[in-house]
């Protein structure tokens, strides 16, 4: 039977295999893809794949290359199954992939395979074909790596690779990546995954040796035809890969990072011009004097703070401060996003979830304070440099005085010093200058939590250190200890702010919260409201309270109102009296014109309504 097929029926084989494989791919595309997209275009891609699959199969039949045929089919099966990973996981990750999306995922590895096979037909001699195989195997390895990453990321987060994940990666470095791996991925699992990746790639490379063969003697006309086929396959491969989810995600991430970099350049240009901007200066110069301190926490969720009702006493200073009438603690504060750069670029600028101002056109609180004649100081324990820090670093770099205590270039959350190192820098600020804005950026509770506090004096939890703890509990204990240390640092900062600088107002909030579990973090793809639950409190001096009784009364009256930290810019502008330009009173938390409530307040850049946080707010919450 086989000899009959090879001798006389190879055309029938080509037709049968083409139709059968087309039917299988069509069915898979229909089952896994949601309605939508250009269905006819999807069908054309699938048919061309089936046609090539049938053609190569028929050729191997005709030449009686049984091992090559079996190896080829095994390779097609392996790559085909890998191509289904994203479409299969998509519904579980609540991601919609239509039939066109699914067809691009299915087509990419098969066009990669057919490109390699066709190229080998054009290269004479075993050495040339081996070179083609090796190059092809490298691309297969990279493709397998992408698919394994899909599986691993889904296993950790129950989500597909997304722009959120890529932006988090862009804000990550080798040190932080190793920390994340050590916390979230057991070493054995990681070793097995890497071994499986290389084993699969190596097996595909080995079996490809059987079918990376072609006609020994190819006529000029045939060779031209093969060249045209190869050109088509390369073009199809590039196009199909560019439309896959991973490629689209990378492209969107690049656009976002590009916008951050553009913002950085805009801030740097504005830094040189804002002081000489007579329009701004004339509008703002009448603002009253005052010393204002803004403290920005890191990864601190109010759900793990004793002052907000958490059962552990890990905020002794803040708990005591909450009883002092000079402090106002706000119970329902949220961050605008779950990641630092996204959150703080909104918190420190005009841009917020409730307006349409492009980020590149948004003035920062530093710009406005400097234009009004305030001396500005930036004191930070976070990295200044690196792609992930450029927007925040650019804002801080506009200050008159800068103290960047984290001198690791591009290392994000790696620091050799605890946050208490910032206090001596604050003590150096001249208290005689009564027109100042000082921003302090803490390292706070960023993972790994155990690196954020000195164990001497702050390793309080667990209270009973003889008991065996679950991995969840270990993380909770370490996080709570870091919160305890942040509370201590805040007490030191407030001591200097009140007794040395005689500050008129001190505002504290965290950039975002944290989900504290065995696998902790603030990944937007795993969104839970705890990731955006943040502490927010304000200290006002008795003198400030006398000068601004209406604002002080509004603070006390609104302590249970909803607030998102992207309104910090307008709120601080209002407190400083910078209300004549680049100011929106509807986003000033203490303004009479403040118009935000549960009906219109959001988080995650306007994608999630706060009213969905039923666990924290209940079903009948109102500003009262």
Regions found by a protein language model. Name each.
Residues 299, 511-512:
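Active-site metal-binding loops of divalent metal-dependent hydrolases
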Residues 117, 423-428, 464-506, 538, ...:
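A long, amphipathic alpha-helix that forms part
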Residues 1-250:
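Transmembrane and membrane-interface helices of multi-pass
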Residues 2-53, 59-76, 94-97, 102, ...:
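Membrane-interface soluble catalytic domains
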Residues 349-350, 408-411, 474-475, 550-556:
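Flexible glycine/proline-enriched surface loops and loop-helix/loop-strand junctions
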Residues 228-466, 564-595:
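Active-site-proximal alpha/beta segments of enzymes that process anionic O-linked groups
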Residues 534-540:
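SF2 helicase/translocase ATPase core recognition
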């Amino acid at each position: 039977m086989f000899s009959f097929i090879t001798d006389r029926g190879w055309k029938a084989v080509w037709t049968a295999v083409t139709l059968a494989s087309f039917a299988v791919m069509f069915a898979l595309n229909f089952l896994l893809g949601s309605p939508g997209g250009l269905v006819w275009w999807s069908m054309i891609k699938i048919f061309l794949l089936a046609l090539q699959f049938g053609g190569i199969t028929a050729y191997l039949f005709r030449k009686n290359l049984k091992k090559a045929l079996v190896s080829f089919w095994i390779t097609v099966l392996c790559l085909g199954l890998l191509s289904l990973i994203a479409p299969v996981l998509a519904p579980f990750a609540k991601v919609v992939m239509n039939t066109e999306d699914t067809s691009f995922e299915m087509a990419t590895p098969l066009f990669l395979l057919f490109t390699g096979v066709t190229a080998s037909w054009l290269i004479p001699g075993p050495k040339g074909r081996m070179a083609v195989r090796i190059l092809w195997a490298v691309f297969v390895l990279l493709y397998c790596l992408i698919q394994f990453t899909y599986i691993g990321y889904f296993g950790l987060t129950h989500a597909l690779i997304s722009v959120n994940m890529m932006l988090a990666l862009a804000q990550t470095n080798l040190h932080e990546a190793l920390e994340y791996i050590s916390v979230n991925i057991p070493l054995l699992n990681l070793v097995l995954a890497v071994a499986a990746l290389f084993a699969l790639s190596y097996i595909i490379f080995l079996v490809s040796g059987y079918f990376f063969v072609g006609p020994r003697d190819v006529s000029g006309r045939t060779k031209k035809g093969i060249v045209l086929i190869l050109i088509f396959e390369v073009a199809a491969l590039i196009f199909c890969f560019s439309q896959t989810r991973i490629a689209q995600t990378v492209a969107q991430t690049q656009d976002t990072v590009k916008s951050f970099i553009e913002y950085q350049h805009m801030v740097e240009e504005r830094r040189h011009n804002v002081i000489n901007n007579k329009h701004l200066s004339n509008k703002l110069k009448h603002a009253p004097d005052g010393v204002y301190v803004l403290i920005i926490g890191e990864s601190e969720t109010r759900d793990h703070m004793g002052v907000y009702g958490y059962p552990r006493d890990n905020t002794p200073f803040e708990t005591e401060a909450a009883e002092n009438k000079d402090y106002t603690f706000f119970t329902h504060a949220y961050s605008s996003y779950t990641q630092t750069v996204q959150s703080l670029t909104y918190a420190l600028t005009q841009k917020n979830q409730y307006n349409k101002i492009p980020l590149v056109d948004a003035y920062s609180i530093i710009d406005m304070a400097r234009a009004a004649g305030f001396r500005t100081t930036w004191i930070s324990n976070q990295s200044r440099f690196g792609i992930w820090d450029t927007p925040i670093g650019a804002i801080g770099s506009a200050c008159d005085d800068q103290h960047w205590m984290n001198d690791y270039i591009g290392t994000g959350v790696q620091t050799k010093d605890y946050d208490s190192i910032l206090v001596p820098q604050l003590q150096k600020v001249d208290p005689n200058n009564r027109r100042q804005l000082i921003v302090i950026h803490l390292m706070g509770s960023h993972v790994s939590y155990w690196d954020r506090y000195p164990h001497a004096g702050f390793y309080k939890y667990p209270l009973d250190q003889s008991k065996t703890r679950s991995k969840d509990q270990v993380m909770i204990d370490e996080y709570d200890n870091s919160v305890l240390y942040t509370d201590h640092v805040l007490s030191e900062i407030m001591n200097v702010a009140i007794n040395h600088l005689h500050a008129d107002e001190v505002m504290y909030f965290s950039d975002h919260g944290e989900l504290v579990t065995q696998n902790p973090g603030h990944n937007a793809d795993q969104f839970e409201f705890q990731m955006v639950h943040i502490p927010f409190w304000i200290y006002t001096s008795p003198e400030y309270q006398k000068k601004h009784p209406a604002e002080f009364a509004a603070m006390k009256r609104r302590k249970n109102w909803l607030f998102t930290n992207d309104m910090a810019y307008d709120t601080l502008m209002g407190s400083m009296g910078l209300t004549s330009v680049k100011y929106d009173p509807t986003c000033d938390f203490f303004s009479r014109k403040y118009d935000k409530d549960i009906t219109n307040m959001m988080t995650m850049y306007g994608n999630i309504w706060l009213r969905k946080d039923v666990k924290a707010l209940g079903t009948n919450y109102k500003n009262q």
